[in-house]
């Protein structure tokens, strides 16, 4: 593994990439789901590609992606605009064609030398996604920033930062897929983008028909809790869940839950319990975990066009007092997670939009201990092919305050899930200890399997 001190990244001056053809000059409204306070932030992802001469015929990835971006923006022209605030801070998109920010860069390093430093929490993120001064605001700033960094091995890293009010993971994938198709020679995206944000406007009149714990202040909040503490000492680490960890966790689940329990559900229950223990929360205090649930697809019965690229999700919250969460077996937390996810349907999403309008776009609740988790293992970023084949890694690269993203990762040829966590430094040590304890195989199983066990932590 190379020492970080020897990495040198050379960047050219940022440039604005505009649509390749004239596009409509107009104002577009965001949906009431897009417009919530929770989404007014920038989300970074990273995609790492090996050299592949048999496929790319020595093409320059910077040139290919720059041109493909410009062509894709003809179809996704709102992303080349700027956000403005209207009355009551309502966001609108000024489709002025100013463009997205693009940075060409090169680094004197190979993918092999970078090793796991491209994985969450990615200590090199600022090198591969330069925060150009003045570009990271929500209002009046570029909605997308892309940096393409060529490596000495012939591979490259594409890092992207997106204003989350414009797209969710599924919407971003549509945009990236369109760019990739253009890079491989397509004349138009295979799935044409659909704006139609009015599909997720609040109803008239708005009416809250579901319980939304994610937006509610809870009783029993302690001023000494994590949410109200000084977060200047926050640290990030990533934790790996492979076959061994999942096997141990499943052994702790009651029979009636095993057949309906997903890997995501089980990891979420485990993290929620371990995090609550690590934060040493008042036993009477309410603690929550929210699962980001995509509204698309038949399962949730939300009727949206295939090319809809706006935010179409909710994050229903499971809630419990800290004491029963910590003292009960893992099945207690798991059942609460499953019940919260099951509340998500079209009515729930409509009720969220109505709540946001009626209550003036409240932030998610800031009282008590709160964790938000997002499953990106099936997001599809690993299938985006610009002409160099599939990426060796693709997805979110760090936890964002209370939000943790689950990403696919292969560890020693074993497929697993990597989860970055953000906690105060003292709590992080306790969290790792709790996680190791709950995923530790019994001694008799270790002897039977003739293998050692561990939970991987990456600083």
Curated annotation (Swiss-Prot):
Residues annotated as the enzyme's active site: 164 (proton acceptor), 385 (proton acceptor)
Keyword Translocase, does the record have it? no
A GO BP annotation: fruit ripening, climacteric
What enzyme category does the UniProt record give? transferase
> Which Pfam families does the entry mention?
Transferase
Tissue specificity as recorded in UniProt: Highly expressed in the cortex and skin of ripe fruit.
Q: Which UniProt keywords apply?
A: Transferase
Report the EC code(s) recorded for this entry.
2.3.1.-
Reaction it catalyzes:
butan-1-ol + acetyl-CoA = butyl acetate + CoA; butan-1-ol + butanoyl-CoA = butyl butanoate + CoA; butan-1-ol + hexanoyl-CoA = butyl hexanoate + CoA; hexan-1-ol + butanoyl-CoA = hexyl butanoate + CoA
Molecular function per GO: acyltransferase activity
- Describe the family membership recorded for this protein in Swiss-Prot or TrEMBL: Belongs to the plant acyltransferase family.
Q: What does this protein do?
A: Involved in the biosynthesis of volatile esters which confer ripe apple fruit flavor. Alcohol acyl transferase that can use a wide range of alcohols as substrate, including 2-methylbutanol, hexanol and ethanol, to produce esters such as butyl butanoate, butyl hexanoate, hexyl butanoate, ethyl butanoate and ethyl hexanoate and, to some extent, 2-methylbutyl acetate (2MBA), butyl acetate, hexyl acetate and 2-methylbutyl butanoate (2MBB).
Q: What else is known?
A: The fruit of cv. Royal Gala exhibits a high ester accumulation, whereas the cv. Granny Smith contains low ester levels; this influences strongly the ripe apple fruit aroma.
Specify the protein name: Alcohol acyl transferase 1 allele GSa
Source organism of the structure: Malus domestica (Apple)
């Amino acid at each position: 593994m190379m020492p970080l001190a020897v990495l040198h990244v050379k960047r050219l001056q940022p440039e604005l990439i505009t649509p390749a053809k004239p596009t409509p000059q107009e104002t577009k409204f965001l949906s009431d789901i897009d417009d919530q306070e929770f989404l007014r932030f920038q989300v970074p992802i990273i995609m790492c590609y090996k050299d592949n001469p048999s496929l790319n015929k020595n093409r320059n990835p910077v040139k290919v992606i720059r041109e493909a971006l410009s062509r894709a923006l003809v179809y996704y022209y709102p992303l080349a605009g700027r956000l403005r605030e209207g009355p009551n801070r309502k966001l609108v998109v000024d489709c002025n064609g100013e463009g997205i920010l693009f940075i060409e860069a090169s680094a004197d390093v190979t993918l092999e030398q970078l090793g796991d430093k491209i994985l969450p929490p990615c200590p090199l993120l600022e090198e591969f996604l330069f925060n150009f001064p003045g570009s990271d605001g929500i209002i009046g700033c570029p909605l997308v920033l892309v940096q393409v960094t060529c490596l000495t091995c012939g591979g490259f890293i594409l890092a992207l930062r997106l204003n989350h009010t414009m797209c969710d993971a599924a919407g971003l994938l549509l945009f990236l897929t369109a760019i990739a198709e253009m890079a491989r020679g397509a004349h138009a995206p295979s799935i044409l983008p659909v704006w139609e944000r009015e599909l997720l406007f609040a109803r008239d009149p708005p009416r809250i028909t579901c319980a939304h714990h994610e937006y509610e202040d809870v009783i029993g909040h302690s001023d000494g809790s994590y949410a109200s503490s000084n977060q200047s000492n926050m640290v990030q680490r990533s934790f790996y869940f492979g076959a061994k960890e999942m096997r141990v966790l499943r052994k702790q689940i009651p029979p009636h839950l095993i057949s309906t329990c997903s890997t995501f559900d089980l990891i979420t229950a485990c993290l929620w319990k371990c995090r609550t223990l690590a934060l040493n929360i008042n036993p009477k205090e309410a603690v929550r975990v929210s699962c980001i649930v995509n509204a698309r697809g038949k399962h949730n019965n939300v009727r949206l066009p295939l090319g809809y690229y706006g935010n179409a999700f909710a994050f229903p919250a499971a809630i419990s007092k800290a004491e029963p969460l910590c003292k009960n077996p893992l099945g207690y937390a798991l059942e609460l997670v499953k019940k919260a996810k099951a509340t998500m349907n079209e009515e729930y999403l409509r009720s969220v939009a109505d709540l946001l309008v009626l209550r003036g776009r409240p932030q998610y609740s800031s009282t008590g201990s709160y964790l938000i988790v997002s499953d990106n293992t099936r997001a599809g970023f690993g299938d985006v092919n610009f002409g160099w084949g599939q990426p060796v890694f693709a997805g979110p690269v760090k936890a964002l305050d209370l939000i943790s993203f689950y990403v696919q990762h292969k560890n020693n040829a074993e497929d697993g899930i990597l989860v970055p966590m953000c906690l105060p430094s003292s709590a992080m040590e306790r969290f790792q200890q709790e996680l190791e304890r709950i995923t530790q195989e019994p001694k008799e199983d270790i002897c039977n399997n003739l293998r050692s066990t561990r939970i991987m932590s990456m600083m």
